[in-house]
Amino acid sequence: MLIIGLCVVSMLLLSSNTFYLSGGVLGGSLVVNWFYPVLGKFGSILIGFVLALIGFIFCSGTSLIRLIVTFYHWLTMKNEQSENAEQEKSTEELEQIVIVKSDRSETENLDQNYLNVEQNSEIETVKPSLEAENISIGKSSSHLINISGLNPEVSIKSEYELANEENEKPQFSFGFDSESLPSVNLSSDSDEQRVSKNDFVAVWNKPVKTVVQEDLAIKSKCG
């Protein structure tokens, strides 16, 4: 069938001369006697292609089909491998990110632990020094003079405060003894005695003794 199809196609498409036919004896006889009078030129060409294709499939089509199938599988496998490789790369990147984050967290935890240890060591070193200072202060305070029997209201001043008070005092102090001034009391209106006409008596009508006594009384009131 492959040979028949090729002979028919070559007879219709290629040119021939008086010495030989392009499709050979088989192609020429089939075209002139069978295909061309019934189907015409276009139908004869179509029949020739169909016969050639069928003959090719029967001759070597199985191997060709297998080759095509294997090529298709190779393409799909290649695509699958590329997809798998991309997925593996993405998973590796994610694992690297997670590992890096975990390493950073571990380093941060180690740094924090180291800082806490340093702070604790500093506190432990400061505690004995403070205790030693407190002991020394207690010993020095035991040597101070303790005065008992004082009233609780009395406060003992330190030498520093006494020195400051002495410095604040003026160097030259002048004392003046001032006499007490007399006090004047003003009587209110209610304390005043009302004077009437009968209280006024002519001086010449009174004796001298009574006049002097009245003057002394007035002076004592004003004083």
UniProtKB/Swiss-Prot annotation:
It is a multi-pass membrane protein. It is found in: Cell membrane. GO terms for cellular component: plasma membrane. Keywords: Cell membrane, Membrane, Transmembrane, Transmembrane helix. The chain crosses the membrane at residues 1-21, 45-65. This is Uncharacterized protein HI_1594. It comes from Haemophilus influenzae (strain ATCC 51907 / DSM 11121 / KW20 / Rd).
